[in-house]
A protein has these predicted regions:
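Sec-dependent signal peptide recognition
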Residues: 2-8
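Bacterial N-terminal signal peptides
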Residues: 8-16
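Active-site acidic/histidine proton-transfer and metal-coordination neighborhood
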Residues: 87, 94, 105-203, 278
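Histidine-acidic metal/acid-base catalytic patches
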Residues: 2, 22-63, 185-206, 210-300
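Catalytic-core regions built around general acid/base machinery
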Residues: 81-90, 157-165, 221, 250-254
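Active-site-proximal loop/turn and secondary-structure-junction residues that shape catalytic pockets
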Residues: 35-37, 69-71, 101-104, 142-144, ...
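N-terminal pre-domain/capping segments
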Residues: 6, 20-134, 282, 286-300
């Protein structure tokens, strides 16, 4: 653990020096903290490494983060919301979004009654409101939903969660992987969800990598369902912009059509030649900061 802390501190110093000398254009840019799970994924690692990691991210140019460590009882990364907000404030960051999972069980689906799930969400929303979070996002769906009737129940569930979020000044969203672009009973799973959720209460956090991996065009979805994608995941599996497979220029050039207000970088793994997740984060940040098609801000 001591070696990890020393290594992080050394890397953070390098990023701090580079940011002072290069002074890239400031852009509103988020990062999913799941990307750094090897450094801060557990509560213990977060407590040990948070100061150095959060400062390093801010020095790279990130302005906000998305969480992925809610315990279901009001704590994020093992901390009370007030403490986590203080940690982020000290680094010059804010938390705009969080990924939390609370699936329905077989009884909920059979009865189409999910009222027993809503107190959990009320606790979740209250905790994240203390952090100033804008978006609460369900990161995935069960992979074994057999019928559109089950998907419809989830859509109604999401509408209900979205109403709770809206009452507290937040937005509820759903994050896709590739499986949502498959068909159930002849209907594309993802399309059905968009068409059967209320745009007042539910947005869709398009993960552009997973969409591309499924063989669909994010931009075509922006055109088909304008305004439904308020926050998107900017991902290239490894460092953003390095594979040449994902058309980030077209994605960002159509951000207004999509309804994008915020975007969040996510890195699934580090390239072998890079070898360090913080360096992967820096390469991704530099790509977006220097890209002429990425605006300084998408918020109104």
């Amino acid at each position: 653990m001591k070696k990890i802390i020393i290594a992080i501190a050394s890397i953070a110093f390098v990023f701090s020096f580079a940011s002072c000398s290069q002074k890239p254009a400031k852009k509103e840019m988020g990062i999913q903290l799941y990307s750094l799970r090897t450094l801060i994924g557990s509560d213990e690692d977060f407590a040990a490494n948070k100061t150095e990691v959060l400062k390093a991210l801010a020095d790279m140019g990130y302005t906000c983060v998305e969480a992925a460590n809610y315990d279901g009882e009001g704590h994020i990364y093992g901390e009370e919301p007030e403490q986590l907000k203080a940690d982020l404030d000290a680094a010059g960051l804010k938390m705009i979004s969080t990924h939390v999972n609370h699936w329905l069980d077989d009884e909920n689906l059979a009865s189409k009654d999910f009222s027993n799930r809503m107190d959990w969400w009320k606790t979740c929303i209250a905790a994240h409101k203390k952090l100033g979070v804008k978006y609460i996002v369900m990161p995935s769906m069960p992979g074994d939903l057999p019928t559109l009737a089950d998907v419809k129940t989830y859509c109604e569930y999401y509408n209900a969660i979205g109403k709770l979020c809206a009452d507290q000044g937040m937005k509820f969203g759903f994050h896709n992987h590739s499986g949502e672009f498959e068909k159930i009973e002849g209907k594309v799973f993802y399309d059905y969800m968009i068409e059967n959720t209320d745009p007042r209460y539910v947005f869709f956090q398009m993960d552009v990598y997973w969409a591309d991996n499924a063989g669909v065009s994010p931009v075509e979805y922006f055109k088909r369902y304008p305004g439904r994608f308020e926050c998107i995941h900017v991902k290239d599996w490894r460092e953003v912009g390095q594979s040449g497979k994902v058309g980030f220029d077209a994605i960002f050039n159509n951000a207004a059509l999509a309804g994008v207000k915020d975007y969040v970088v996510e890195i699934e793994e580090t390239s072998p030649e890079v070898g360090d997740i913080l360096e992967s984060c820096r390469i991704s940040a530099d790509y977006l900061l220097s890209a002429p098609f990425v605006k300084e801000s998408y918020s109104e």
